[in-house]
Structures are given as C-alpha cells and as structure tokens.
C-alpha cells in the first residue's frame, strides 16, 4: 500500500507523549515544590528549570530518573501561560530502551500524586485520568463530550455502561487494575443504565457501539492502524469489585497499537533530544569530547582546503611562468 506523503511518524517505542491541564492556583510553585520533594525522596535523580526565554512564553522543566533495572528516563515538561481554564502543559519523555507499562508514568516525575493536586486533567474533556467520570445528565452535553473524546489523540478514552445501578464494589476505577504506566493515560467515562441509547447515538459517527453492560475503547484521531471498533468492545464488564480482565486487555492492546505522533509532541521530542540541559558529569564529558572532535574535524577540513588552494595557486603560477618563458603572450582579461 502506498504511504501518503503527509503521513506523520508514529510514537517511537521508547517515548511517552502526553499533555494535561493544571486547574489549581500557583502552578509554577506547585511544580517546583513537587520536583524538590521528588528529588529529596529519591524518586527522581535530578531536575532543572530552564532560564526564561523572551521569545517563548512557556516555562520548561527537565527531570531525569531511573526505572526498572536502572533504565534512564529523561523527561521535558513545558508549562503554558495561564488561561481562564488553567495552565496547559505538554510532556515528552524518552527511555534508553522501549518503555514498559510496569514503569511509573513520567507524569509522576513532575506533578504531585495526590488526587487534589490539580496537575493532571485532560484538556479536551476537563476530566481527571484514573478516576470514574460519570457522563453528564444532559443529552447534548453527552454528545459533545463523547464526540470530542473520540477524537482525542492524547488520552485513551474508555466508555463503560452500567447495566444496573452499582454499589461500592462497582465504584472501583479501571485505573486500579491497570499497569502503572497506563493509569495517567486512561479517562474512564461511566454511563448510567438509562444512558445506553444516548451514549451509542453520540458515538455513531466513529462507528463505535458500547454493549449493554459492557465497554468500548474509543479510537482517537486519527485512529491507530489496526484499530477495529468490534475488537476493542467488551461485551460484559462485571462491576462487582473483581478485575475486569477483558477490559484491561482491550486497553493494553490499544496502547500497543502504533499511534501517530502529534505535531506538538514531535517538536517537543526534537527539543528533548537536541537541546537537553540536565546532563550528568559523564554526559558533560562526553559532550565536550564530541565538541572537541567536531572542532578538530572542522580544522582539519579547513587546513586541507587551504593546502589544496595553495597547491592550485602554485601550479597556476608555474604554468604562467612556463608560458612566459616560451614566449606566449598572455591574453588580456578584457
């Protein structure tokens, strides 16, 4: 199949990319305090706030940690200026090897983990990942919300229909059963028994149908290659406090699909790779050696160019002398 010239790259297996919104006050102070606490506790190795840039309004923070058996993860978070809805942020992180879902989310390398910290909200819906989010009571609001969430390229949106009113056992969030690396990426929408029709009516444009008493993973936009609505619909989710194995599997399979790298994330990833400041001593030495090698190569090239130029000039001079000695008249340049 031919590849479109406009096709965007997919997210590399070593990379996380997400965005969020801070809805509280004093976002900068919260972020700085959280980073200091994380470093003091040994949860991150180090962090750095980059100097303000007059040409860019965002504040930029870098954080580095080790996960698993010592795999280094570098992360970059940019915090946008405040708006009436809060302060949006964009995070990209890259590990030394393909990411593992059992590793903590890079969001925890910056923001406090407390539910009331205000750091992690989905800008598209205003909802907080990792919690149960009931659908609005108003039908039009349901349609608007699900329409927007079905096209969200950043988060994984899951709609669960309650076959009957649940008790406390049924109010365990899906995130409770998910690997650490997915808990900050999944937004769980809950539809009441009476909202079965309006839920599916709202999703008809993306060809998704939530089974009665079941669940569905929404496609996002663009839908990842390999996504088929039926393959990511779960026929029955028992909200009785037991692990929803089939739904966890559907979310994990969706997360494994190759997804397009959003333009904003691509730019942030380039900055992470090419303009990283939070270096270890070994990394600083390596960078200095690379700079010395680069300068040496440039000097060598200049020297060779100079020598070639001098050699060519000498040959031209010799040829001119030979013409003169042979009595050849040199043509006028005019």
Where are these regions (language model features)?
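Heptad-repeat coiled-coil/leucine-zipper oligomerization helices
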Residues: 264-308, 312, 316-319, 326
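Extended, charge-rich intrinsically disordered regulatory tails
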Residues: 329, 333-334
């Amino acid at each position: 199949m031919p590849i479109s010239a406009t096709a965007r790259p997919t997210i590399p297996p070593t990379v996380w990319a997400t965005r969020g919104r801070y809805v509280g006050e004093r976002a900068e102070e919260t972020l700085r305090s959280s980073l200091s606490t994380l470093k003091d506790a040994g949860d991150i190795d180090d962090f750095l706030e980059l100097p303000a840039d007059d040409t860019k309004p965002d504040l930029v923070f870098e954080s580095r940690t080790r996960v698993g058996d010592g795999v280094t993860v570098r992360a970059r978070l940019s915090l946008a200026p405040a708006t009436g809805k809060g302060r949006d942020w964009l995070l990209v992180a890259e590990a030394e090897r393909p990411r593992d879902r059992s590793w903590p989310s890079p969001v925890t390398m910056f923001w406090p983990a407390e539910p009331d910290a205000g750091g992690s909200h989905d800008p598209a819906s205003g909802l907080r990942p990792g919690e149960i989010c009931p659908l609005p009571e108003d039908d039009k609001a349901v349609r608007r919300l699900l329409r927007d969430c079905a096209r969200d390229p950043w988060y994984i949106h899951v709609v669960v229909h309650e076959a009957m009113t649940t008790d406390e056992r049924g109010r365990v969030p899906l995130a409770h059963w998910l690997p650490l690396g997915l808990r900050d990426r999944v937004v769980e929408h809950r539809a009441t028994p009476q909202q079965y029709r309006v839920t599916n009516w709202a999703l008809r444009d993306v060809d998704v149908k939530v089974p009665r008493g079941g669940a569905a993973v929404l496609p996002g936009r663009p839908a990842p290659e390999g996504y088929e609505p039926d393959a990511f619909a779960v026929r029955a989710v028992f909200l009785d406090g037991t692990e929803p194995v089939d739904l966890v599997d559907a979310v994990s399979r969706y997360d494994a699909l190759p997804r397009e790298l959003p333009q904003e994330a691509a730019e942030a990833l380039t900055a992470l790779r090419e303009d990283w400041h939070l270096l270890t001593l070994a990394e600083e030495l390596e960078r200095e050696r690379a700079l010395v090698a680069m300068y040496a190569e440039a000097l060598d090239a200049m020297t060779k160019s100079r020598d070639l130029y001098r050699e060519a000039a000498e040959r031209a001079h010799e040829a001119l002398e030979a013409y003169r000695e042979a009595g050849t008249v040199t043509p006028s340049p005019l």
